[in-house]
UniProtKB/Swiss-Prot annotation:
PROSITE patterns reported in the protein's UniProt record: PROTEIN_KINASE_ATP (PS00107), PROTEIN_KINASE_DOM (PS50011), PROTEIN_KINASE_ST (PS00108)
Location(s), subcellular: Membrane
Topological domain spans for side Extracellular: 25-517
Record protein name field: Senescence-induced receptor-like serine/threonine-protein kinase
Domain Protein kinase: 574-847
Length: 876
């Protein structure tokens, strides 16, 4: 009976394995994603036959790029020719459903090849996370290094999240993401995951790596370079064709083996771990591939350092046997010895293949699954335009914008306790998903376009103490239970600015009053409308007088830029649906032209910027073209409708980042590059235009950032040309912004290119410090240049650098940047550098370029800064 049970168990296991292998061969357990190829596209790899699909369905951020042309014809696999990079966020995540869901074991592999896709020639470094837990660091040697990172784990959820995390050493990217279903009975350990350290095929020199279809799990086997001390055995027969071993190394891998050339009694396998304290599991795969005589055998003992861990291991002909270290191993150097026992007919040890995995213990506990599901539903329902990727709460440094979480102890899942998605362009009804946030205390949905009634389930959230739904389009009656909780003080309820929403005890009275007393209000409203119409006509008439009669007030100007009718502008902006910016000129709206996003600047009737400034901006943008100046797509010039259409800048303006209005914190490297971009744009205005142009309103909010965080100068309505033959001065009424205005202007009432230099210097100081141009206290207002000078006089560079950087910056470049900024903000223009000199100095910081200074006068080779003494900051 026992023998029958054993036979039954073997047959069941064999059939299960056979079923699994059949499915592995048809790729039903594979997910293969080529990052960066066009949306919804796919193809079959020419070598492996694996079907790769676009990553567009698995990620909602990032920029797709193709590697540099010089590498595209170098024989690299097709799936390495494109990448998706992530310049905008600290953490960016793929969310991928696993082939069989949770509870099954998977091999998850990411592949990276830089290929100079961004034309920067700087190989980035960044971190890789699986969900909330650190996986590994990504470090590439050069542009053509192909790096594979693999991890084996059993997910707790149906989806896995693979995240790249920026650590201020270049922009993270991903080339390939692959998931492979494994047997749960393989790679068994008591730990959360195993990270691949190496996987070796003891084979012939020059052999290519083996993978699918040779390997049913699509593991990539790297050929080992064999030294002269060893020799290679091989066979042309298939190894393990009867599916003897669940690990199933590729037959092409197992058909070769390594042994000592002098038929030594032992074979030594050694490796030096990158971390001597880390724990490793070692998997040795063996198969006899030589035909032995009847009296011959190949067996050996396996030793770890000085201890035997397998007293006798005997090989079988053309069948794979796998030895796994019973416990994890560690140390500075790990030595395995395969030792042949004495005997005339015992052959020396061999090895066919080897895998080494590092133990990965998941120390971070993810957000409670109920909260995760709720937040994902909210994100999907409202298409929230925030950086909501990965786990909502963990790691704390990368938690979702607008949420706060709490974790009662180190063994429980964090819970969402506060959610602020006010002014987030939410539309539709309040979704039932909010009812699953059972730990939430504060919920702010104000400033959106939510419709329908306030759902009663909000009153049942047991921990809710603050609810704000102001400024929506909600209708009906506030639920009685919410009203009662508001009255008894257990809930702070705000629901104003919803015209069709009322409390239960006031609605009937309001309706009665509206029915019986509508005549008088209608009369009053009619009178008000007439008065307002008359006032508007009068103001419009006065505005026309102020703007003058410059001839071309209606219709196209003399420019090659595209002219749009106002009706077209209405369509481009979808009836001015989405405001993306505001200023003294009016509002900026989001628009789309032929599928491309644009920014639509509409001059309001009340704007201080009149037709003169509008015409100046069109004229200037018509003749300037530079990568660091915003480009004009088109314009509209109809009576009462003046519109400028620019290229769309996805990351808005520098001012928002410095003021902390965006959750993303600019790294030191990004700040340096943005500063250089802005300086290059201004340098082009000063030296690349004939006649030269002074911007006159340089400030952070006029420095726009595209999806790559490339900076471009904007807002040229106040710009003016100046003469280089004459004094180079512009006599002008006041222009510019307080804090950025050239101090000489107050005495001379004139501005020149050095005025832009001063303004840029103030911007550079803001970039360094993260502080505003003017800091106000109860007793005084201090300009940022005076504040920085006073601190640097004591040699304290760390005292001025933005604390949000947490000292993740180069001290030397911080000193140099400060020197440049203070030189630019000298009170006397003659002591300031030219914009060309500023660009030269910034390039030295950003690129480490040693520039040729022979074209500059000796007196301007060094930017000096006048502090309280004549000291120049050099304490680096």
């Amino acid at each position: 009976m026992a023998m029958l049970k054993s036979l039954s168990s073997i047959l069941f296991t064999s059939f299960a394995l056979l079923f699994f292998l059949v499915h592995a061969q048809d790729q039903s357990g594979f997910i293969s994603i080529d990052c960066g190829i066009p949306d919804d596209s796919s193809y079959n790899d020419e070598t492996t036959g694996i079907k790769y699909v676009s990553d567009s369905a698995f990620v909602d951020s990032g920029t797709t790029k193709r590697i540099a042309a010089q590498f595209q014809s170098s024989g690299f696999d097709r799936h390495l020719l494109n990448v998706r990079s992530f310049p905008q966020s600290k953490r960016s995540c793929y969310d991928v459903p696993t082939p069989r869901g949770k509870g099954f074991k998977y091999l998850i592999r990411t592949r990276f090849m830089y290929g100079n896709y961004d034309d920067l020639g700087r190989v980035p470094e960044f971190d890789l996370y699986l969900g909330v837990n650190f996986w590994d660091s990504v470090k590439l040697d050069d542009a053509t290094t192909i790096l594979n990172k693999e991890i084996i784990t059993i997910p707790l959820l149906d989806n896995v999240q693979v995240c790249v995390v920026d650590k201020n050493a270049g922009t993270p990217f991903l080339s390939v993401l692959e998931i492979r279903l494994l047997l749960n009975t393989t790679y068994e350990t008591p730990y959360d995951a195993l990270t691949l350290l190496r996987r070796l095929d003891y084979s012939k020199t020059g052999k290519l790596p083996s993978r699918y279809k040779d390997d049913i799990y699509d593991r990539i086997w790297t050929p080992r370079i064999v030294s002269s001390e060893y020799k290679i055995l091989n066979t042309s027969l298939t190894v393990d064709q009867f599916l003897n071993n669940g690990y199933q190394p590729a037959s092409t891998v197992m058909s070769t083996a390594e042994t000592a050339r002098n038929e030594s009694l032992y074979l030594t396998l050694s490796f030096r771990p990158p971390d001597p304290n880390a724990k490793f599991y070692v998997y040795m795969h063996f198969a006899e591939i030589e035909v032995l005589k009847s009296n011959q055998t190949r067996e050996f003992s396996i030793w770890l350092n000085e201890d035997v861990i397998s007293p006798s291991f005997k090989l079988r002909y053309l069948l794979t046997d796998t030895f796994v270290t019973p416990d994890p191993v560690s140390g500075i150097t790990i030595n395995f010895s395969l030792l042949q026992p004495p005997g005339e007919f015992v052959l020396p040890p061999i090895i066919n293949a080897l895998e080494v995995y590092q133990v990965n213990e998941f120390l971070q506990i993810p957000t409670h699954p109920q909260d995760v599901d709720a937040m994902r539903k909210i994100k999907a329902t409202y298409r929230v335009k925030k950086n909501w990727q990965g786990d909502p709460c963990v790691p704390v440094d990368y938690s979702w914008e607008g949420i706060d979480c709490i974790q009662s102890d180190n063994t429980t899942n964090p819970r969402v306790v506060s959610l602020n998605i006010s002014f987030s362009e939410l539309r539709g009804q309040i979704d039932p998903a909010f009812s699953n946030l059972t730990s939430i205390r504060k919920l702010d949905l104000s400033g959106n376009t939510l419709t329908g009634e306030i759902p009663a389930f909000l009153a049942n959230l047991p921990n809710l103490t603050e609810l704000n739904v102001e400024g929506n389009k909600l209708t009906g009656i506030v639920p009685q239970r919410l009203h009662e909780r508001s009255k008894n003080g257990s809930l702070s309820l705000r629901f104003g600015r919803n015209p069709d929403l009322c409390l239960s005890d006031s609605c009937s009275n309001t309706k009665k009053k509206n029915k019986n007393g509508y005549i008088i209000p209608l009369v009053v409203v009619g009178i008000i409308v007439v008065l307002l119409t008359a006032l508007a006509l009068f103001r419009r008439f006065k505005k026309k007088q102020q703007r003058g009669t410059l001839g071309e007030r209606n219709g196209p100007l003399k420019t090659a830029k595209r002219y749009f009718k106002y009706s077209e502008v209405v369509n481009i902006t979808n009836n001015f649906e989405r405001v993306i910016g505001k200023g003294g000129f009016g509002k900026v709206y989001h628009g789309v032209i032929n599928g491309e996003q644009v920014a639509v600047k509409v001059l309001s009737e009340e704007s201080a910027q009149g037709y003169k400034e509008f015409r100046a901006e069109v004229d200037l943008l018509m003749r300037v073209h530079h990568t660091n100046l915003t480009s004009l797509v088109g314009y509209c010039n109809e009576i009462n409708h003046m519109v400028l259409i620019y290229e769309y800048m996805a990351n808005e303006n520098l001012g928002d980042y410095l003021a902390g209005k965006r959750s993303f914190i600019l790294s030191w490297e990004e700040r340096l590059k943005i500063s250089l971009d802005a300086a290059q744009g201004l340098e082009y205005l000063h030296n690349g235009c004939k006649p030269p142009i002074v911007h006159r309103d340089v400030k952070p909010t006029n420095i726009l950032l595209n999806e790559k965080l490339q900076a471009k100068m904007a807002d040229f309505g106040l710009s003016r040309s100046f003469s280089v033959e004459g004094s180079g001065q512009i006599s002008t009424v006041v222009a510019g912004s307080i804090g950025y205005l050239d101090p000489e202007y107050y005495s001379t009432r004139q501005m020149n290119e050095k005025s832009d230099v001063y303004s840029l210097g103030v911007v550079l100081l803001e970039v360094i410090t993260g502080q505003p141009a003017i800091a106000s206290s109860k007793t005084e207002k201090v300009h940022i240049s005076d504040h920085v000078r006073s601190i640097l006089a004591n040699g304290d560079i760390r005292g001025i650098v933005d604390q949000r950087l947490r000292e993740r910056y180069d001290v030397g470049s911080a000193w140099k940047m400060s020197e440049i900024a203070l030189a630019c903000t000298e009170h006397t223009s003659a002591q300031r550098p030219t914009m060309s000199q500023v660009v030269m100095e910034l390039k030295q910081i950003v690129y480490g370029i040693v520039t040729d200074q022979e074209n500059y006068d000796d007196s301007t080779k060094m930017l000096t800064v006048n502090l309280d003494t004549e000291m120049v900051p050099r304490a680096r």
